[in-house]
Amino acid sequence: MLSPKRTKFRKQHKGRIHGLAKGGTDLNFGSFGLKAVEPERVTARQIEAARRAITRHMKRQGRLWIRIFPDVPVSKKPAEVRMGSGKGSPEFWVARVKPGRVMFELDGVPEDIARGAFELAAAKLPLKTKFIARIGEV
């Protein structure tokens, strides 16, 4: 699963996801993409599940790019531990995804296969998405 090799700080505030994505809103690598429509935190496990769904549907043909990376640690206290006595230890990693962000890109496959692969991937993700394509591809 995806996670940073090292970080400046072990723990981070939860924060909020405000506004629209500034960068990463257009297709840069592939011909087809899966774009986020709403703000959400996507975990490393969800990204991996979506990646597996896409690669299985494509039957190992074409090329996949993952355009998001989980770089925010989420801490959690153990079960049945009383409140207080500090913040819990980092449990998993998430990527903060803003609306308009292209999360996955595909190339080297027909449009119907790409659309089907992204439908399977969208079912694994906690946010609404839409299918996008380069002009002239559809």
From Swiss-Prot:
Keywords: Ribonucleoprotein, Ribosomal protein, RNA-binding, rRNA-binding, tRNA-binding
Gene Ontology process terms (BP): translation
Cellular component terms (Gene Ontology): cytosolic large ribosomal subunit
Origin: domain of life: Bacteria
Keyword Ribosomal protein applies: yes
GO molecular function, one term: tRNA binding
Record-linked CDD domains: Ribosomal_L16_L10e (cd01433)
A Pfam family this chain is assigned to: Ribosomal_L16
Similarity remark: Belongs to the universal ribosomal protein uL16 family.
Cited PANTHER family: 50S/60S RIBOSOMAL PROTEIN L16 (PTHR12220), LARGE RIBOSOMAL SUBUNIT PROTEIN UL16M (PTHR12220:SF13)
HAMAP family according to UniProt: Ribosomal_uL16 (MF_01342)
Known role: Binds 23S rRNA and is also seen to make contacts with the A and possibly P site tRNAs.
Assembly information from the UniProt record: Part of the 50S ribosomal subunit.
Protein name per its UniProtKB record: Large ribosomal subunit protein uL16
Gene that produces this protein: rplP
